[in-house]
Amino acid sequence: MHRSVPEQVSAELPATLEQFQITLGADVEDRVEECVREAARCLYRGAIVQCGALGELLIDYSWEKLNARNWREVGREWRAVYSYGCLFRAVGLCSVTGSIEEALQVCDIGLLMGAEIMDNLLGRIISVLQRIAPSREETKLEAERGVREPGLESSKLHSPGEHSNKKSFASVTGRKRIREGPEADFDPKGCSISEKVPCLLVPVLDSETAIPKLHCPSLEHFRDHYLVPQKPVVLEGVIDHWPCLKKWSVEYIQRVAGCRTVPVELGSRYTDAEWSQRLMTVNEFITKYILDKQNGIGYLAQHQLFEQIPELKEDICIPDYCCLGEASEDEITINAWFGPAGTVSPLHQDPQQNFLAQIVGRKYIRVYSVAETEKLYPFDSSILHNTSQVDVESPDQNKFPRFSQASYQECILSPGQVLFIPVKWWHYIRALDLSFSVSFWWS
């Protein structure tokens, strides 16, 4: 291995070329497989620049294959080629002074778009690269932030347990903190326009439509009264032990995940014509869409962040009630939902049972049973067939006359609460504050 490659990165790679596993399927052309093998040979004979160049060639070629058909139809073989390309490109960048952050980004995109190779080698290299350049990233953060946000405590000065998420996120949601108490008592005048905080109205809930709340039910009680009959319920006290409820702050997320690349939704809701997605670092997302409210709506939504960043996964747990399903723990899909006040998930349904755990901020949620489907006017298209055409909080009664006849339940989900959404139940979600939620899809 060439000495220009950081020793910590070299330590993660196989010791010899013979131990470097290249496993590709029959669909991959011989010349492409030979390119992968030549890049590996370059790596082990110290031709790092050539190795990186071949990696870039593999990325470009396999990218065309990944985009030639529907993503679900793309075989693992070409995604593996993409991952090998990212690996070789990243190693090449590691040998260039000042390119560690770019190497991190290349590895992350390999994780997001490619397939796992060599026992999660890309993930292990990312962990190494994060350790190599933490001080550089912290210096960059301070430069972007300028003067430290008042009230946003330095993680170096306080241990995670010394402040709750309410305090840690207060400076971002506004210095005038939302007063505690019943949700219906929330005063929107407490928001300060000058602080660029949206003054979002909080719905006043009707007791007849409120989703019931239950404190730490037994597995049997939850199964018999909610899972089997398929009824929504807000669970309380079941995630109080999760470290994230005390540890997570904007600064903590930046420190642990700031340099990582993630997909961000741009636009108020995915049904809008101007909606789009873009890859960016968590730091860029926070700077543009959390700390600065003038760039429109950005939402880190429905992303398997915890598979990408194991450090964050250590702060949560899979709810015990998931054991009542037939699937194994590995088959449970865990998604992160992180965004400013005002993000909206249009009325839609999911094909699995759903536990939505609220970590930071509050969300207004309305749910409709499957029996109400005809009154909810789903899109006719195959892509959006699980999504309603109706704007739930501002429906067009002339266009959707039966919508007002649909029965629903609703809640305001607060930190520490978990909402059970039965399979295929329709649900609409709007963030009332800066919010971080974790969903668990299980069968």
Curated annotation (Swiss-Prot):
GO molecular function, one term: histone H3K36 demethylase activity
Official protein name in the record: Lysine-specific demethylase 8
SMART domains reported for this sequence: JmjC
Keyword Cell cycle belongs to the record: yes
Keyword Oxidoreductase included in the entry's annotation: yes
Subcellular localization(s) per the UniProt record: Nucleus
EC code: 1.14.11.27
Chief localization: nucleus
The protein's role, per its UniProt record: Histone demethylase required for G2/M phase cell cycle progression. Specifically demethylates dimethylated 'Lys-36' (H3K36me2) of histone H3, an epigenetic repressive mark, thereby acting as a transcription activator. May play a role in the regulation of the circadian clock.
GO annotation terms (biological process): circadian regulation of gene expression; G2/M transition of mitotic cell cycle; positive regulation of DNA-templated transcription
Gene3D superfamilies attached to this UniProt entry: Cupin (2.60.120.650)
